[in-house]
Amino acid sequence: MNKIRLLPLVAASLLSLGTAAQTSFPGAETIRYEAPEGTTHAHQVRSATSFYDPGEGVAYLDSVEYYTADYVEAEDGSVYLSNPFVFFPTDTWLKLDRAGGDTLVARLPQAMFEGDDGTVFYARRMVLSDRGDGELDCLPDETETDVRFTLRGDTLALVDGGLDEQGMPRYILGLATATGGWSCYGEGLTTIVPLRYEPTQKPEGKPEQTIHFVHYNPFIEDDMDEEVPAVCDGDKIYWQLPYSSNSGETYWVVGEWRDNRITVLPQYLGVDTWSCLHLFAMPADYLPESSQLDPFDLKEMLVLNYNPSTETYESAYENQTLLVNVGPDRVYYADSYVTPRLQSLPSTSILSRPRLDTPAPSVCYSPDGRGLRQPTRHGIVLRRNADGTVVKQVAR
């Protein structure tokens, strides 16, 4: 994620009371918790420039990709957009009215969220204002209240005013109170398009068996041995990743067996509906000495070589990684599996005891041509059983 911290970005308060007095603000009873009947476009791909508060009382600006978005085209031609604020899902709907041709208009303010203390937050058109002392305010726009969208073909987009000389959106769709107090959440440069990928799914009619997916966890600095279901289908092996969403979705990845090795390519895993994310399995390298926030570098493939002495498919080199990543284009990961290996493959599969007439070389090569040694990590591992319990054992 490309984060730019605005130091400090101050929420407007009583500065906009004059504007509030001239604007009609609907009550909490007008919040739309459901959309009307119509054509639903679910799990679209949203990209945006988004503001959010990480809990510090200031706003951060972030360009986001591969977040989900839902909208409904109602029978009267209007459009209802769910959760218009990426980092503050309200589970409510913003109404966009037809304004001729492919143009839609969000007539603002619209009530979007009611706080525990009864404070109503509204979708409002807002602008950044330089206070002249090195600080910025985000204030309701005094020249115009509405924002416009276009729906052209299968693309829904916010009509933005471009960027100012500081690279900030000239106006945003913000979440604020009637008095102009900004929540530090808002959207600019929003585009919503259909998803172009199909998720990896296990083949139907094939028996599942349990295998061990072992990997290093850099955050606890230890190995994890996790029992996961797997399905073999010819020269392919499918296994369920340990990552699961709070909504209960599970995700499968597929690798292809050839020349005594398993190759895993980038692939779409599916939607995390709880976090509103599109997830991908992305090969990468872990960079333990890196100081960057996300210490991984995306790669073209992940390779697991067969080790006949342990009957295990092992990572071709240390720190090779499989990421559960948001989108396929940059590192923004939900989970990571460093130096992975597969153990206890189904005995009915050709992968469990492959022919050794074309063995994998003892020295492996990464996509950039570096000679790399086989992994040598041994010792104590953490093993997760099928019932969820975790025990320590000696790696063999």
Indicate residue ranges for each PLM-predicted region.
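Hydrophobic alpha-helical segments, especially N-terminal targeting/anchoring helices
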Residues: E73, L163, Y365-S366, R384
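Hydrophobic h-region of N-terminal signal peptides that target proteins for export
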Residues: A11-A20
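Tryptophan-anchored aromatic micro-motifs
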Residues: S24-E65, Y80-F85, R196-D225, I237-Y243
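Residue-level detector of functionally pivotal "anchor" positions at catalytic/ligand-binding pockets or at interdomain
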Residues: V338-G371
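C-terminal tail/sorting-segment detector
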Residues: N2-K3, L382-R396
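Edge beta-strand at a domain terminus
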Residues: Q22-H41, G167-T210, M224, Y317-S347
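Predominantly extracellular/secreted and cell-surface proteins with exposed
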Residues: E65-V147, M224, A230-F296
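Sec-dependent signal peptide hydrophobic core
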Residues: R5-A11
